[in-house]
């Protein structure tokens, strides 16, 4: 009996150690996915075009390969919506958000969302805007994180809450996809503890000019909607990441109004606590032909993805959902 208890105690200890160990996402996965998403053949992934549809099919294929659970009754990962208006170059009047889930072990009816947008701004007659950072980097990370968490689940280290992976379309047009989703959610937003949104995490802010340039990430939203957000960020960082978490865009004097400019905002307006991870690349290559995969800072990109994955795990495994105790105050 004593021998059995010793083995049981050892097993519990090893499980706790595994859960507290810093995540190590395979860089090769990030490279593989981003090489496809930022390729000329996807024609800049503009909403309403065949390029976006090619990207959507790639995402659906990998959701299936990973084994994510679809929400639609017909087994589809797609949430279709009609485009608010047509623009020159569009070949269809609809687009889709790509939604899949890893079901939670003990609280499957509660959710953590991780989101990115897979659209970009398209092409001209002669050039393609590949959007490697914006937001190929977030979309590639979404797939790599999903693969990692599914593998952990198969090894008996599943998370308590369900994790929902959403690749939004229409972000560049005005947050179309996430607005439609938040008005027509496929699961309860009241039971959603948080949205972690990743939009541009593969580059550096060329205006930063600080010694920590290769070890930072901008975090937006830590002082809004929930007082639990900041402590959980610090707790996750102490797991061995030691990233510089820069909150400059949470200033009420932020002239760029970054908090309102990506898909997380459509969760926030519904009362869901959000965090937005961002590299700050506002100048230089932002929405330019030069936003190419060759300029991705791979080691820093991977550091950020590892941190975001561990934060997601902490959100999913904590005893209670995040408090909703701070008004948004638009």
What are these model-predicted stretches?
Residues 279-330:
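His/Asp/Glu-rich mid-to-C-terminal helical/loop segments that flank catalytic regions of hydrolases
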Residues 37, 83-122:
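Acidic/His- and Gly-rich active-site-bordering loop/insert found
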Residues 168-270, 274, 323:
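Metal-dependent peptidase/peptidase-like ectodomains
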Residues 20-24, 40-50, 86-88, 126-135, ...:
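Second-shell loop/turn segments in exported
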Residues 25-54, 66-72, 279, 285-288:
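N-terminal capping segment at the start of a domain
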Residues 1-21:
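Bacterial Sec-dependent N-terminal signal peptides
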Residues 45-102:
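A non-catalytic alpha/beta surface segment that caps or lines the substrate-entry region
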Residues 98-100, 114-174, 308:
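Alpha-helical metal-binding/catalytic segments enriched in His/Glu/Asp
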